[in-house]
Amino acid sequence: MEMFQGLLLWLLLGVAGVWASRGPLRPLCQPINATLAAEKEACPVCITFTTSICAGYCPSMKRVLPVILPPMPQRVCTYHELRFASVRLPGCPPGVDPMVSFPVALSCHCGPCRLSSTDCGGPRTQPLACDHPPLPDILFL
């Protein structure tokens, strides 16, 4: 009877593994279009623009016995290849640089979170917003 239960468990886990490997229920890490906002304190407007960012699921694991072993590094969806684009904020006073640069994702991968280039926080409940009045969307892809 124990052998039968072990065989049944092995078959169930095997089938579950095949089913799970067919594809994740969430989209994998990839470039997606997103609308972002740009403003500067001295400039009277906010510009929203559409660009590509990295977003999606990265497989992760958590140790069952974290007290005994050190924590496993968690990978995040981050830039693999990128280029930079810029927008000009209209109406900035003299002496204030009106240009705002931002990354455009060309490709993404799951890797360690580097605070120098990645927002490592979780999903946001509200989009980033501006304090100044917005101008119409600009498209950068």
Swiss-Prot record:
GO terms for molecular function: hormone activity. The keyword Disulfide bond applies. Glycans are attached at N33. Keywords: Disulfide bond, Glycoprotein, Hormone, Secreted, Signal. It comes from the Eukaryota. GO terms for cellular component: cytoplasm; extracellular space. GO terms for biological process: G protein-coupled receptor signaling pathway. The keyword Disulfide bond applies. Residues 1-20 form the signal peptide. It is found in: Secreted. PROSITE patterns: GLYCO_HORMONE_BETA_1 (PS00261), GLYCO_HORMONE_BETA_2 (PS00689). Disulfide bonds join C29-C77, C43-C92, C46-C130, C54-C108, C58-C110, C113-C120. Promotes spermatogenesis and ovulation by stimulating the testes and ovaries to synthesize steroids. PANTHER family: GLYCOPROTEIN HORMONE BETA CHAIN, LUTROPIN SUBUNIT BETA. Heterodimer of a common alpha chain and a unique beta chain which confers biological specificity to thyrotropin, lutropin, follitropin and gonadotropin. Belongs to the glycoprotein hormones subunit beta family. This is Lutropin subunit beta. It comes from Bos taurus (Bovine).
